[in-house]
């Protein structure tokens, strides 16, 4: 196999003398192209078809070389619709892989898989481009220190902390606050870490992508008046795109994130929604290329494809890429090869609960189902670990007692269990938090809570020092001092009403 030399040299796209071939065969989004002897393109090279169709409309299709078939023929996958293409049309080898714009000029903009802006705001003013196929950072460049990535969100930082440069799976259905949580994380990384975010919509519904863009503009994550002050770049490959585009859009987003990490030396947050669609697109392409399917009809190269994407998401000595990936689980089967392969790469899982959302507790992160490999005494320290374990024990006991409470009522519980229930309800409410990006909807100012403050707050609840405060005082507040202040306000309101 001829591999592309540009993929091993980050940021370099050396273009040789461009050779031209002819389309030999078209099967859906897959093209077979014949080149002159000795002029074959490398694997992953971008090919361009520029012509006119029978209605004299301009055709501009970019493809990526996937296989060398022999007899001077290559098989390529199109990144856009192949409508209007015909056998015999001229195909130009660009001599390099797909390259996309990178840097500060990408912030606040929406791109497609080719790095072309699709937001009708004109061309991108960026001279720097990176090829989307790049090697993972060398082992000696990696930052192997285990450090917590503080998000300022109490429930995440205490019970399922994120690893700096780690990978987090975000599990949640429709309407439980996934988008708001994503936007808050984008906002907090910009304010607390001076970082930026890249959002990769892989197999997204176009409507959802549009809604996210509009909500980001409303909340100030994207600054319309001064686009350079935006905190996020968006890359979309929607559901209606050919499988080639959906398979590569994740790499486009990752390439933009790598520039911020390696060149700007920033902490970057990379969102991929949905990582399952990346696998699904790879499965479609694999079948189109004639590969024998593997387990459950997935591509035989499933682990390799997932690994090549995930290994590039890492912390180096220059900066970090922390990735949050929405994971769709087909038919709720966690043993399905797609989610099972993803789980092998995750450091933490954040599970959003419809039950908590229906109670009005936001963020609706399930404190018992969410997990993290970082929650170990040697990493987070004994104080943090013990507080988190006691919080989980209290909530678990409350969960066990709920059936008894529903049938017999609170009065039938022992004194100790009644105290556990009261504290668990306070903990549940204290895990809620007003978000900066939701200020326009709630009217409450957003709160960023430092990890030390979070631990102190839960320790005070568990110790019983705050047993006298009403549970409403803990709902939608930042640190524990605000809960005490809110309790005094509630008491004064009750007195004035009497």
Swiss-Prot record:
Reactions that this protein is recorded to catalyse: ATP + H2O + 4 H(+)(in) = ADP + phosphate + 5 H(+)(out)
Keywords: ATP synthesis, ATP-binding, CF(1), Chloroplast, Hydrogen ion transport, Ion transport, Membrane, Nucleotide-binding, Plastid, Thylakoid, Translocase, Transport
Membrane topology according to the record: Peripheral membrane protein
Extent of Polar residues compositional bias: 1-14
Keyword Protein biosynthesis: no
EC number annotated for this UniProt entry: 7.1.2.2
One Gene Ontology cellular component: chloroplast thylakoid membrane
Region (Disordered): 1-20
Cited InterPro entries: AAA+_ATPase, ATP-synt_VA_C, ATP_synth_F1_bsu, ATPase_a/bsu_AS, ATPase_alpha/beta_chains, ATPase_F1/V1/A1_a/bsu_N, ATPase_F1/V1/A1_a/bsu_N_sf, ATPase_F1/V1/A1_a/bsu_nucl-bd
Pfam families assigned to the protein according to its UniProt record, in alphabetical order: ATP-synt_ab (PF00006), ATP-synt_ab_N (PF02874), ATP-synt_VA_C (PF22919)
Tagged with keyword Plastid: yes
First-tier enzyme category under EC: translocase
Residues where ATP binds: 172-179
Molecular function as annotated in GO: ATP binding; ATP hydrolysis activity; proton-transporting ATP synthase activity, rotational mechanism
GO BP terms in the entry: proton motive force-driven mitochondrial ATP synthesis
Localization: Plastid, Chloroplast thylakoid membrane
CDD domains: ATP-synt_F1_beta_C, ATP-synt_F1_beta_N, F1-ATPase_beta_CD
PROSITE patterns: ATPASE_ALPHA_BETA (PS00152)
PANTHER family, per the entry: ATP SYNTHASE, ATP SYNTHASE SUBUNIT BETA, MITOCHONDRIAL
Task of the protein: Produces ATP from ADP in the presence of a proton gradient across the membrane. The catalytic sites are hosted primarily by the beta subunits.
Family the entry assigns: Belongs to the ATPase alpha/beta chains family.
Name of the protein described by the UniProt record: ATP synthase subunit beta, chloroplastic
Organism this protein belongs to: Hordeum vulgare
């Amino acid at each position: 196999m001829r591999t592309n030399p540009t993929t091993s040299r980050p940021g370099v796209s050396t273009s040789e003398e461009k050779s031209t071939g002819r389309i030999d065969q078209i099967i859906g989004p897959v093209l077979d192209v014949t080149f002159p002897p000795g002029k074959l393109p490398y694997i992953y090279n971008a090919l361009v078809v520029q012509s006119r169709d029978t209605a004299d409309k301009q055709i501009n299709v970019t493809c990526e070389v996937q296989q060398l078939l022999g007899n001077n023929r290559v098989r390529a996958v199109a990144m856009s619709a192949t409508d209007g293409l015909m056998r015999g049309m001229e195909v130009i080898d660009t001599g390099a892989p797909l390259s996309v714009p990178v840097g500060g000029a990408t912030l606040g903009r929406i791109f497609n898989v080719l790095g072309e802006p699709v937001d009708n705001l004109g061309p991108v003013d960026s001279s720097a481009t990176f090829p989307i196929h790049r090697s993972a950072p060398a082992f000696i460049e990696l930052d192997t220190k285990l450090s917590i990535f503080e998000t300022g969100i109490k429930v995440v930082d205490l019970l399922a902390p994120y690893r700096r440069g780690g990978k987090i799976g975000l599990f949640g259905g429709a309407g439980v606050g996934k988008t708001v949580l994503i936007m808050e994380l984008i906002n907090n990384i910009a304010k607390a870490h001076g970082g930026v975010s890249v959002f990769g919509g892989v197999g997204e519904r176009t409507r959802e992508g549009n809604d996210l863009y509009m909500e980001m503009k409303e909340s100030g994550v994207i600054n319309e008046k001064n686009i350079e002050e935006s905190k996020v770049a968006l890359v979309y490959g929607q559901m209606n795109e050919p499988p080639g585009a959906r398979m590569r859009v994740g790499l486009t987003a990752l390439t933009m994130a790598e520039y911020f990490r390696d060149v700007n030396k920033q902490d970057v947050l990379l969102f991929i929604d949905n990582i399952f669609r990346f696998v699904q697109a790879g499965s479609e392409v694999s079948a189109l290329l004639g590969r024998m399917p593997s387990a459950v009809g997935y591509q035989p190269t499933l682990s390799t494809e997932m690994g090549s994407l995930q290994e590039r998401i890492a912390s180096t000595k220059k900066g970090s890429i922390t990735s949050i990936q929405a994971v769709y689980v087909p038919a709720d089967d966690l043993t399905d090869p797609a989610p099972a392969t993803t789980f092998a790469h995750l450091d933490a899982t954040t599970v959003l609960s419809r039950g908590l959302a229906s109670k009005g507790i936001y963020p609706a992160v399930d404190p018992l189902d969410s997990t993290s490999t970082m929650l170990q005494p040697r990493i987070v320290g004994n104080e943090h670990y013990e507080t988190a374990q006691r919080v989980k024990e209290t909530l678990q006991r409350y969960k066990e007692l709920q059936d008894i409470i529903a049938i017999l009522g609170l009065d039938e519980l022992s004194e100790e269990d009644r105290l556990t229930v009261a504290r668990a309800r306070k903990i549940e409410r204290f895990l809620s938090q007003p978000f900066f990006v939701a200020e326009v909807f709630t009217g409450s100012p957003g709160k960023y809570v430092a990890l030390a403050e979070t631990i102190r707050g839960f320790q005070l609840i568990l110790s019983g020092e705050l047993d006298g405060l009403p549970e409403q005082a803990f709902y939608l507040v930042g640190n524990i001092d605000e809960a005490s202040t809110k309790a005094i306000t509630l008491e004064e309101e009750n007195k004035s009403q009497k």
